[in-house]
Amino acid sequence: MLYLASRSPRRQELLQRLDVPFQTLQLDVPELRAADESPDQYVQRVALEKAHAGLALVQAADPDAIVLGSDTEVVLGERVFGKPVDVDDAIAMLRELSGRTHQVLTAVVLVCAQRAPARALVVSEVAFDTLDDAQIAAYAACGEPMGKAGAYAIQGRAERFIRHLSGSYSGVMGLPLYHTSQLLTAFGAH
């Protein structure tokens, strides 16, 4: 059985598009970046920790379990933008992203007891239009930025702010479907 180690409704929705049966695991894995950790190392480590935590949870009951862990972070330079803690934090993030091109890093990891983990790191570039304070305040007030890395949802109202995207649209949402499908096929789960 395939298990998704994620609370994200977007990841659940995206994984359903691959027509692979799966169950969702509700896990709390700390997402704290070490001072000497690069953004790509960080996102890959968190995805691996989520997958391993999920495997530890289900392995006794399902020895053949395959667990998918994923993490997405918005990066501008060396700064990693996590999920905003409140509306003011969302506004600050959106002001920094306004008029600039940032990266969205999404790591996907598959683990099981029988083999080494399979991994993918997908890097997308997103160019934001220049936003004025009224646009930022209105978007932050709608609630959509909360719970989203970088304080925006590309699949939602923020799509109108995206001047250019290079990379994986589904990766920016939280689960790059092409790469996930390739990993699942290599693991024999697709």
UniProtKB/Swiss-Prot annotation:
Q: Which keywords appear in this protein's UniProt record, sorted alphabetically? A: Cytoplasm, Hydrolase, Nucleotide metabolism
Cofactors: a divalent metal cation
Q: Name one GO cellular component term.
A: cytoplasm
Read off the InterPro entries from this record: ITPase-like_fam (IPR029001), Maf-like (IPR003697)
Please give the CDD domains that the UniProt record associates with this protein: Maf (cd00555)
Localization, UniProt? Cytoplasm
Q: What class of enzyme is it?
A: hydrolase
Q: Provide the reaction this enzyme catalyses.
A: dTTP + H2O = dTMP + diphosphate + H(+); UTP + H2O = UMP + diphosphate + H(+)
Q: Where is the active site?
A: D71 (proton acceptor)
Q: Matching Pfam families, A to Z?
A: Maf
State the name under which the record lists this protein.
Answer: dTTP/UTP pyrophosphatase
Predominant subcellular localization, coarse grouping: cytoplasm
One GO MF term, please? UTP diphosphatase activity
Gene3D superfamilies named among the record's database cross-references:
3.90.950.10
Known role = Nucleoside triphosphate pyrophosphatase that hydrolyzes dTTP and UTP. May have a dual role in cell division arrest and in preventing the incorporation of modified nucleotides into cellular nucleic acids.
PANTHER family recorded for this chain? BIFUNCTIONAL DTTP/UTP PYROPHOSPHATASE/METHYLTRANSFERASE PROTEIN-RELATED, BIFUNCTIONAL DTTP_UTP PYROPHOSPHATASE_METHYLTRANSFERASE PROTEIN-RELATED
**Annotated site residues (Important for substrate specificity) in this chain:** R10, T72, Q155
Q: Which GO terms describe its biological process?
A: nucleotide metabolic process
